């Protein structure tokens, strides 16, 4: 499904091995979730799947196609193939709006006006359902592990296009 989402082949980066060897906190969280019946499979298998997904090597173009697929109701804008049901778009978008920037998600939403997801490799992808998907990639990260330049680029695009719902054009009500 991920290949269909981005429209091309992805690779597992070398970071997978080092991340697997050092992800003690995530291992603890996985077993804690298992204890509270929130992980229904083997925690080690679930954690390995999560770590592999976090270690996927993608380009800014791949991120943009993935974001565009979500924005386009599950239809890949390049291949024109339905990747997932359109009814999942609001669920995906609300999820990345609330946790895509982890503890900074609220600040991000207010200052950018677009739900977005960050990656530790310096990528940020944003989704405006029914409008477009956008991404930027720049490895220098801030103290929270988010790309400084990618954030600035996406905020610039949103503000330049007047699409930030929190500071965009105002409607005048006429009696």
Spans of model-derived segments:
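Structured C-terminal helix/loop/strand segments within mature extracytoplasmic catalytic/sensor domains
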Residues: 70-175
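Active-site-proximal helix/loop microenvironment
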Residues: 13-79, 83
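Short glycine-rich loop/turn motifs that provide flexible caps or phosphate-binding loops at active sites
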Residues: 6, 66, 121-122
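Single conserved hydrophobic/aromatic residue that forms the stacking wall/gate
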Residues: 1-12
């Amino acid at each position: 499904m991920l290949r269909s989402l981005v429209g091309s082949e992805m690779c597992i980066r070398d970071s997978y091995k080092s991340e697997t060897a050092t992800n003690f906190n995530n291992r603890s969280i996985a077993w804690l979730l298992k204890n509270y019946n929130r992980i229904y499979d083997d925690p080690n298998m679930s954690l390995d799947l999560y770590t592999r997904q976090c270690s996927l090597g993608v380009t800014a173009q791949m991120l943009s196609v993935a974001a565009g697929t979500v924005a386009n109701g599950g239809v890949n804008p390049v291949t024109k193939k339905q990747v997932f049901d359109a009814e999942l778009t609001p669920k995906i978008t609300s999820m990345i709006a609330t946790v895509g920037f982890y503890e900074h998600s609220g600040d991000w939403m207010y200052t950018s006006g677009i739900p977005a997801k960050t990656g530790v490799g310096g990528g940020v992808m944003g989704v405006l359902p029914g409008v477009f998907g956008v991404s930027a990639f720049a490895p220098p990260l801030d103290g929270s592990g988010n790309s400084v330049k990618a954030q600035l680029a996406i905020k610039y695009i949103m503000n330049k296009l007047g699409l930030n719902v929190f500071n965009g054009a105002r409607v005048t009500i006429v009696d």
